[in-house]
Amino acid sequence: MSERRFLVTGSSGHLGEALVRTLRRDGVDVVGIDIAAGPATDIVGSIADRGLVAEAMSGMTSVLHTATLHKPHIGSHPRTDFVETNIEGTLSLLEAAVAAGVCSFVYTSTTSAFGHALVGAREAAWITEAVASVPKNIYGATKTAAEDIAHVVHQDSGLPVIVLRTSRFFPEQDDNDRVRNRYRDDNVKANEYLYRRVDLADVVDAHLLAAERGPEIGWAKYVISATTPFSPDDAAQLRTDPGAVVARYFPEQPGLYAARGWSMFPTIDRVYINARARDDLGWQPRYDYRRILDCLAAEQDFRSPLAREMGAKGYHDEPTGVYTT
């Protein structure tokens, strides 16, 4: 198979559609599959349908597996649905990829899989790939289980598998009432770029690099989040006075925030570290807190063109509240 051919699962979702659009603009042959119809979806059906998946997998060189039930689905779907989609669906894709001779498999996971390990009691938790997961809900538990299954399939078959634990990149409002009531949405997202958010365009870049580097890497798991300005020496003060830490790194930040009526969070409980992804994949995320402040100073939208193009999709056909991932 000399020509690249991608199968993108979850192609009607936020990341999946962004991947399909990006690949098609680059002239790459790509097929989108999703349980819901959408402009980037060629095959409508479940990834747990092994016959459908085997047919869709034929001739593919790479799989970008973004399809999942997310945290917002916890209140609307039984646990069995999470097992069917996140575990059985992933296994179906992995085994079909092995049978089809796929060259690389990229699995979109989540930093939520770290679960209870994310919150540091006396100082901000420093979250790298070495931190052990302690799942706290069915979403995190099934994503972690699917990661482990992917590792087993890699060990048994040699299928190159790269797991990307992505931080927040959704455009929807935060699901925490206190956060929504106290801060403007753009204020929230700007703050999060310091420690727990990544732009959609950078997530797309990470997936495409993972697909490219997968065959030489074989197996790996990476944290995908904007590059933090912080160091481990900041961890204690981030828990008690993050505003002082941020102002030390960015002296212009207090003035830029004051001009908009914005404020920093009273505490930062974790920091995601992306160093391994940058080193191994050659990933160079472009959207970080430095860029956010530069955009604020220039009175420009700090989102990437791709993020603005995709907008918000939500997680339910009939929303009943605020949903995040």
Language-model segments: residues:
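Catalytic helix-loop patch of NAD(P)-dependent Rossmann-fold dehydrogenases
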Residues: 84, 88, 120-161, 189-190
